[in-house]
Swiss-Prot record:
Origin organism lineage: Bacteria, Bacillati, Actinomycetota, Actinomycetes, Mycobacteriales
Name of one Pfam family that matches: Methyltransf_25
Similarity remark: Belongs to the methyltransferase superfamily. Tam family.
Function (record text): Catalyzes the S-adenosylmethionine monomethyl esterification of trans-aconitate.
NCBIfam families (alphabetical): PRK14103.1
Organism encoding this protein: Mycobacterium tuberculosis (strain ATCC 25618 / H37Rv)
Keyword annotations from UniProtKB, A to Z: Cytoplasm, Methyltransferase, S-adenosyl-L-methionine, Transferase
Major subcellular location class: cytoplasm
Gene3D superfamilies from the UniProt entry: S-adenosyl-L-methionine-dependent methyltransferases, Vaccinia Virus protein VP39
Protein name: Probable trans-aconitate 2-methyltransferase
CDD domains recorded: AdoMet_MTases
Length: 261
């Protein structure tokens, strides 16, 4: 179960990639803007400001996130983004930190391009940090008893979930899109007693929490702390540097043909 409040604890750090992603969409006016994986809706509101007058459509798989979005005035729907189909007036599709949960997201991107009208835009940001020490520590601990039996079928994400920037660039170029693809590793300066644990509690540890009792969950967290502290030791000033790689792709549907590319 996703907890909007836990997820938003690091909103200042998590919001920046969204703004950098959307800033590269080169469309001044839009009829319909879609936020796939809208979360608690705090960033969806920015889309309404960026494209005033547009219909804002939002979707998330978590009922808790959709409820939080509704509290912010967002008319969000609970659903699976794999089932989403664009309406004819869709001009912009944004998916920020969601597609890594969908193993077949490459096929999904190609399908969206095929279903959207020329001149539409797709903007996607995907975390690409699944081989980092934080994820490796979670997987290693989950393989130990008493957790292994409870979590043996969790599809923990690994590096292969997210491909290289060149892969996505070629994938979208082959569909006739004009593309802008890049990656960035953010060096987040976190504070708090166990900041990396707190960060991943709002994201990577969500499927773990769903499998464990309250007592087992607290035990898992306590056993994870020394693993994370070894990988991300606090600095003398009390802060912790947390590197986080993210991949961005912005595509104008049919743009390559119109620009002669």
């Amino acid at each position: 179960m996703w907890d909007p409040d836990v997820y938003l604890a690091f909103s200042g750090h998590r919001n920046r990639p969204f703004y950098e992603l959307v800033s590269r969409v080169g469309l001044e006016r839009a009829r319909r803007v879609v936020d796939l994986g809208c979360g608690p809706g705090h960033l969806t509101r920015y889309l309404a400001r960026r494209w005033p007058g547009a219909v804002i459509e939002a979707l998330d798989s978590s009922p808790e996130m959709v409820a939080a979005a509704a509290e912010r005035g967002i008319d969000a729907t609970t659903g699976d983004l794999r089932d989403w189909k664009p309406k004819p007036d869709t001009d912009v599709v944004v998916s920020n930190a969601a597609l890594h949960w969908v193993p077949e997201h490459s096929d999904l991107l190609v399908r969206w391009v095929d279903e959207l009208a020329p001149g539409s835009w797709i903007a996607v940001q995907i975390p690409g940090n699944f081989e980092t020490p934080s994820h490796a520590a979670v997987r290693a601990l989950a393989r130990r008893e008493p957790y292994a039996k409870l979590m043996r079928d969790i599809p923990f994400r690994v590096g292969a979930v997210v491909q290289s920037p060149a892969y996505y660039a070629e994938l979208l170029m082959d569909t006739g899109c004009k593309v802008d693809v890049w990656e960035t590793t953010y060096l987040h300066q976190l504070t708090g007693e166990h900041p990396v644990l707190d960060w991943i509690t709002g994201s990577a540890l969500v499927p773990v929490r769903e499998r464990l009792s309250d007592e087992s969950w607290q035990q898992f967290r306590q056993e994870l702390i020394p693993l994370l502290n070894d990988a991300y030791p606090p600095r003398a000033d009390g802060s912790t540097i947390f590197p986080f790689r993210r991949l961005f792709m912005v595509a104008e549907v049919g743009g390559a043909r119109r620009s002669g590319g």
